[in-house]
UniProtKB/Swiss-Prot annotation:
Main subcellular localisation: membrane
Name used for this protein in its record: Cellulose synthase catalytic subunit [UDP-forming]
The UniProt record lists the keyword Transmembrane: yes
Catalytic activity: [(1->4)-beta-D-glucosyl](n) + UDP-alpha-D-glucose = [(1->4)-beta-D-glucosyl](n+1) + UDP + H(+)
Transmembrane segments: 30-50, 151-171, 173-193, 230-250, 525-545, 547-567, 592-612, 640-660, 668-688, 833-853
Length: 872
């Protein structure tokens, strides 16, 4: 290149061009790309006045305007990227420069839209005001009970007949399209309306569309003339029927969450009952158990009516000594039958309190736990169990490996934030094994904690409900614990839950037997069906391959009719669940959770259905470390197999599109879209299997609370605690303070009206943000520190409301990014024998994505550049 430029260009220009070429090479560009980049630069200088001030402003804003194009490392097709991005920017700039009449028209539309949203927001209050008289007087109150039942029966009968006609009426494609547009229009109108009416209306619309779909599938889409198509079609129909049943039961379960609030306790503390607190442990480290015991010691309850027990199934001397030192009771069994359930039942022989509260050994209760829960027991004598959420202050494997901790609701948020609240409406709250209070009398009547299944908690609540006792759920977190540290441990825990729920289904089926109300039966069945999702999920992940590889018509219908039935079913279900579950489960994330677990829960649930007594109990490990980032190849092996299988389907689909019958082209396209969606979800599952580093033994909890620090010379400075752990704190000093790294200071924290002092050492200083390391504490100081931090009554209450609102399209984009991230990890960590395949695939996707225009990264100087760009 230097010889050619020396011959064509004058020395100063040649030297500058050679310098630019070397700069490109230094930043990683290939020789070809660097040479081509220099050539494009020469053409730009010839045809574009780059020295003009407007072009200079654009060049200064290059990173903001062209964020995906690296000016220091050119690529061969960068001019195409510049052209696409420039057109994108010009379209955006022209929108801002619209003529005044258009701007006024647009403003008018915005005004109409704003008034519509305001009207929708005010509608529930208006309806409530107009119908207030109905709350004071029943319209049919003058009729006898029999007449009212007759009228209600007639209304229900006619409603069912109309629903049946609506579901079963056959439509041609045009009529089906018009019908769907009407329903979709209604859904768009009511979805922004606050209150429960809009959710109920969306449920009705979703059920209408989904029931029409499942009716159409059973009556019009099976190919009875082709055995292969029939078998594959029936397998898919089985999975879809399962999904439809779970959808219907799920709507029923959460249609009206109760949102129970605390009941005040009597002022006379002599009326407060006695409570035993059980903390069962088996193989956990003492450091995991200490915080739970320390927090239990600080629970606001009369000390003469509170007994704390360590139930040590490991029989360890250090635990017995610890219990003696802090003044709690200790029980160790000589035999270990029935695992945790047997451990608790053994302790029930010694505890004599009127109530028993159970905490897993890593669940730290707040000081207000009993005061928030016990009032309901005094109000309702038939109440046997009160459950509170399982809240976790450490990230679970999904949150940690994907970097989503406190950014996206975790896997358990839906159950503890919404499902249990919905169960409470139907008096079907499940006992979850921890963070709960149980009345001793009903517990003794059923023989203690159930031992026949490995999910003793749910089985115990089922037995209590069969006896006619009630249960309750309070959504306010009153304890927090450690999430599982690795994906393998997380999957092991879910396997146990899945097998246990299927065992209950076989051994004590809630659909049969006495004592349960109809609504309770449905709630229990839905919980058990949830854990049978493994096989249906695997079917969905492989179903389109039946057509691409086996030429089996799994849905024997024209592609247009498939689109007119399948897409509305999926869209309405997604829209409705986003409205109902948005705070607790973002759209499309259920696909990731179920895909990760599907392969592993399918075999044990199938075995439990056949032989419910087969299997063993496993204990979930807590408090471990992940010292290096790595791919769990054992766990991810099934996902990789499914990825490869779907890639084969893609290859065959491409061949069939170009060389297959023209009449099948649209069906091939539909199947390929399904395969690509499955590949995205499987890529997300692979991304979860990449274990991120976890090198902290003490997890940091982000929380703001006032504090103060005192230097050794007596100077006192106010500060705000930003995060804390069992080993230290992060604080922000209010104002100026001379704090040096390594300096010893005292930290002052308040609990109620009492102030506590803790010795610390400054570990780091960054401006007014300071990291403090706790110095060795006495036992009493450690108890006080836990009660001032982890056990504060307000520590966890606001976490559930901190998640952003669900936006389905943004959530879909997150899943797309997550899937691509999984394949990048495969390319990075894969063995050399297959690394090349994934590198080629990820490079190909990255290359295609690099041409997509980006939204400019705004800065204060970006606006003039946009205007300059529009004027060129």
């Amino acid at each position: 290149m230097s010889i050619l430029t020396r011959w064509l260009l004058i020395p100063p220009v040649n030297a500058r061009l050679i310098g630019r070429y070397r700069d490109y090479r230094r930043h990683g560009a290939s020789a070809f790309s660097a040479t081509l980049g220099c050539f494009w630069m020469i053409l730009a200088w010839i045809f574009i006045p780059l020295e003009h001030p407007r072009w200079q402003r654009i060049r200064a804003e290059h990173k903001n305007l062209y964020p995906h194009i690296n000016a220091s490392r050119p690529r061969p097709l960068d001019p195409v990227r510049y052209l696409i991005q420039t057109c994108w920017l010009l379209i955006g700039a022209s929108r801002k420069e619209t003529p005044k009449p258009r701007r006024r028209a647009f403003s008018g539309l915005q005004n109409i839209r704003g008034r519509y949203h305001q009207w929708m927001n005010e509608l529930p209050e208006r309806v409530s005001h107009k119908t207030q008289h109905l709350d004071e007087k029943k319209e049919l109150g003058h009729l006898s009970a029999g007449a009212r039942r007759l009228i209600l029966g007639i209304i229900v009968t006619f409603s069912l007949i109309l629903a049946l006609i609506c579901v079963t009426q056959p439509f041609n494609p045009l009529a089906q399209f018009i019908f769907l547009m009407l329903l979709w229009g209604v859904a768009l109108i009511v979805r922004r309306m606050p209150g429960r009416f809009s959710a109920l209306m969306l449920i009705v619309l979703s059920l209408t569309v989904s029931c029409r779909y499942i009716w159409w599938r059973y009556t019009s889409t099976l190919n009875w003339d082709d055995p292969v198509s029939l078998v594959c079609g029936l397998i898919l129909l089985f999975a879809e029927t399962y999904a439809w049943i779970v959808l219907v039961l799920g709507y029923f379960q959460v249609v009206w969450p109760l949102n129970r609030q605390p009941v005040p306790l009597p002022k006379d503390m002599s009326l407060w009952p006695s409570v035993d607190i059980f903390v069962p442990t088996y193989n956990e480290d003492l450091n995991v158990v200490k915080n739970t015991i320390y927090a239990s010691l600080g629970i606001d309850w009369p000390k003469d009516k509170l007994n704390i027990w360590i139930l040590d199934d490991g029989g360890r001397e250090e635990f017995r000594q610890f219990a003696q030192n802090v003044g709690v009771k200790y029980i160790a069994r000589t035999t270990h039958e029935h695992a945790k359930a047997g451990n608790i039942n053994n302790a029930l022989k010694y505890a004599k309190g009127e109530f028993v509260s159970i905490f897993d050994c890593d669940h730290v209760p707040t000081r207000s736990f009993l005061q928030m829960t016990m009032g309901w027991f005094l109000k309702e004598k038939q109440l046997a169990m009160m459950q509170t959420p399982h809240h976790f202050f450490s990230p679970d494997p999904f949150e940690r490996n994907l970097g989503r901790f406190r950014k996206t609701p975790n896997e358990g948020t839906l159950f503890y934030g919404l499902v249990q609240d919905g169960n409470d409406m139907w008096d079907a709250t499940f006992f979850c094994g921890s963070c709960a209070v149980i009345r001793r009398k009903p517990l003794d009547e059923i023989g203690g904690i159930a031992v026949e299944t490995v999910t003793e908690d749910a089985h115990t609540s089922l037995r209590l409900h069969r006896r006619g006792y009630t249960s309750a759920y309070m959504r306010i977190p009153q304890a927090a614990g450690l999430a599982t540290e690795s994906l393998s441990a997380h999957i092991g825990q879910r396997i146990r839950w899945a097998r246990g729920m299927v065992q209950i289904f076989r051994l004590d089926n809630p659909l049969t037997g006495k004592g349960l109300k109809f609504a309770q039966r449905l709630c229990y069945v839905n919980a058990m069906f949830h854990f049978l999702s493994g096989i249906p999920r695997l079917i969905f992940l492989t179903a389109p391959l039946a057509f691409l590889l086996l030429h089996a018509y799994i849905i024997y219908a024209p592609a247009l009719m498939i689109a007119l039935f399948v897409l509305p079913h999926m869209i309405h279900a997604s829209l409705t669940n986003s409205k109902i579950q948005g705070k607790y489960r973002h759209s499309f994330w259920s696909e990731i959770y179920e895909t990760v677990l599907a392969w592993y829960i399918a075999p044990p649930t199938l075995v439990a259905l056949i032989n419910p007594h087969k299997g063993k109990f496993n204990v979930t490990a807590k408090g471990g470390l992940v010292e290096e980032e790595y791919v769990d190849w054992v766990i991810s092996r099934p996902y990789i197999f499914l990825v490869l299988l779907n890639l084969v389907g893609v290859a065959v689909g491409i061949w069939r599109y170009f060389y297959g019958p023209p009449t099948e082209m649209l069906t091939v396209v539909v199947s390929m879209v399904w395969v690509f969606y499955n590949l995205i979800v499987l890529g997300g599952a692979v991304a979860v299997s990449v274990e991120s580093k976890q090198v902290r033994r003490s997890h940091r909890v982000e929380m703001t609370m006032p504090a103060a620090i005192a230097r050794e010379d007596g100077h006192l400075f106010s500060c705000t605690v930003q995060d804390f752990s069992d080993g230290g704190l992060g604080i922000k000093i209010n104002g100026q303070a001379q704090i040096l790294e390594g300096q010893k200071v005292n930290l002052l924290l308040k609990r109620g009206q009492q102030e506590y002092v803790f010795p610390t050492q400054v570990a780091r200083v960054m401006g007014n943000e300071v990291g403090l390391k706790l110095m060795p504490l006495t036992t009493q100081q450690h108890i006080d520190f836990v009660q001032c931090t982890f056990a504060r009554a307000d520590t966890w209450a606001l976490w559930q409301d901190s998640y952003p609102e669900d936006k389905p399209l943004e959530s879909l984009l997150d899943i797309l990014k997550l899937g691509f991230r999984g394949y990048r990890h495969l390319a990075e960590f894969a063995p050399s024998s297959v690394k090349g395949i994934f590198r080629v695939l990820t490079s190909l996707v990255s290359w295609v994505v690099s041409f997509i225009p980006r939204r400019p990264e705004r800065s204060e100087t970006a606006q003039p550049s946009d205007q300059a760009l529009a004027q060129q």
